[in-house]
Amino acid sequence: MSKYVVTATWDDVPHLGDEDKADILASTPPHLRDARSRGIPHIGSGAVFPLSDDDLACEPFEVPAHWALVGGMDFGWDHPFAAAMLAHDRDTDTIYLTHCYRQKQATPLIHCEAIRKWGWPGLPWAWPHDGNQHGKSDGRPLAQLYRDHGLNLLSDFARFADGSYGLEAGIMGMMEYMQAGRFKAFRHLSEFFEEFRMYHRKNGVIVKEREDLISAARYAFMCRRFGEAKPQSGPARLAVIRY
């Protein structure tokens, strides 16, 4: 017997009038309103980010040439490798997630080929502390494998300026920017929003499942001070990247 999922929205329940919908939405937490009205899955109790997609989502745009760019990556094999790129408007201290990538059971070469086109050879990449672990085949640190394929990984693993690198500190930092309207994500990055909706705590502890892109974005966020503008070969007014 096969199984399948059907998404139902308020349009499928004609007995609900506009006034009924307004009353229900008013009594529903913001981060659950899309789930209630449009059938989009979202964790309820224990959500790490009690926000809706619309609190973060923005339409893609060409990133101005002077904005700083930084990438972040989270290593993985059976659980996916993930990468994210942030663009930082330092004039307003607003951060935009412009690109993301997630793939499991692929080699560093495959990942590097997929993400190197986002920026330029000097794009700085933040990475987690497990990148210092030595590989079983040739003894090279995991981070070095990505350097050997041409990516500009930062000299040390991701941490804040004060040296801290805890999970909670990174998540709370991102949350502050999100709630202030200063962490945005391009609307078409569906894989990121899937993780964003389901990221949750159990017994007060963050569940480390299906959070690969969030982790990659978190490492980039922690190292945004190392972001750089893409060198320009033409007039500076040209956009750095196209989404």
Where are these regions (language model features)?
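Short loop/turn segments immediately following beta-strands, especially the blade-tip
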Residues: A87-D91
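Short, glycine/acidic-enriched loop or turn micro-motifs at the edges of active sites
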Residues: W77
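Mg2+-dependent endonuclease catalytic cores in nucleic-acid-processing enzymes, primarily RNase H-like
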Residues: T92-I206, G227-Y243
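Short beta-strand scaffold segments in enzyme catalytic cores
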Residues: F81-L86
